[in-house]
Amino acid sequence: MRILHIWDQAGVAFVLAKYQRLKGHDSKVIMVREYDKYGIGKFYNQYVIDATLADFDQKSFDEAHSADILHIHSRSDMVFKFREEFGNSKKIILQYHGTDIRGIKKQKLPHRSKLSDLAVRGIFTYRRLRDLILIKKRIHTKAQRLADAVIVSTPDLLPLVSKAIYLPNPIDTDHFKPDKISSRPERAQALTMDTEAIDIQLTLSYCKKNNLKLDIDVYNRIRDPIMYGDMPAFLKKYRLYVDVRYVDGKILENLSKTALEALACGLDVLDYKSNRRHGLPVEYDPMNVTSRLETIYSR
């Protein structure tokens, strides 16, 4: 099977391509390298077709001619373009990952410099306007009708998409795995991440309200991105990952991708109900996820 992933979100497309190849498929990802903030595309370089924003559409069409499956991540606009170009000769899959369908009212700035904040604010403004246009013109609904299947990466997205199929995020267990011998240095007991979408003050208030007496490191991933290749070593400096996340004032019930990666590395994870979890659940094993995806492709 020849599979072309269009765009990537949080490394999901790259991990799928890697394990699809291990299962004997010809799978690759076309992505704009300038958007590779965390070095994920660089880490999975052998699976990447590099493009610029200017030539992304044309390169996507060129590569799509030889593909059986066009698996589009977030870019619902590409569904129309591919269906118009190829009619029903290609199977088109649309996958949503979170804010691409849920939306977000407010995003934080990295505060590296005034120039940086100005540039990032411009990007945020563009995204909000783009999302408003997509909703107003019912682009998402139309794209979902044109796709052969629509996938969501977390269960909370199911009510937002008619006839959606939930597919767990695959975690690269070759990359995220426990050390054979524990050698964690003495430092803060727990870790949590401050990201563009998260209200970290609500997270800390939650911990205080629930009497969670933890020594927590709050890492600002907006200002200081951690490269994907370095992420396992960084996580394994801690024993517990606090995965309590508020977006637009609402607590998220699903485990974040970082929390899943922490579980794969051997950390405990504190979820939104203050439950401690240990061990990566089997549904996130990449071979299991790709097997489930094959059944979606074959429908």
Name each model-derived stretch.
Residues 33-35, 100, 156-157, 167-177, ...:
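Short beta-strand->alpha-helix junction loop in the catalytic core
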Residues 236-238, 258-268:
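Conserved donor-binding/catalytic loop of nucleotide-activated donor transferases
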Residues 172-228:
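Conserved catalytic-core segment of nucleotide-activated headgroup transferases in glycan assembly
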Residues 59-65, 100-103, 111-149:
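Membrane-proximal helix-turn-helix segments that form the acceptor-binding/catalytic region
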Residues 275-299:
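A charged, aromatic-enriched C-terminal amphipathic alpha-helix characteristic of glycosyltransferases
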